[in-house]
Amino acid sequence: AEGCDRRFSASDELTRHIRIHTGHKPFQCAICMRNFSRSDHLTTHIRTHTGEKPFACDYCGR
């Protein structure tokens, strides 16, 4: 994009970066139809629907 001089060593990093400029969000939540530019953001979002909390404190278990 004009004015962007970012460079990447891996093509997937460039692909992910291009989405910032295009606004392309190819990952969609099947529950609420919200779209995300990254699959890891969708995975985290889905937990808002399921209530899943996969990370617990080793000290107190919460």
From Swiss-Prot:
GO terms for cellular component: cytoplasm; nucleus. Pathway: Protein modification; protein sumoylation. Ubiquitinated by WWP2 leading to proteasomal degradation. Coiled coil: none annotated. A zinc finger (C2H2-type) spans 1-21, 27-49, 55-62. It is found in: Nucleus. It comes from the Eukaryota. This is E3 SUMO-protein ligase EGR2.
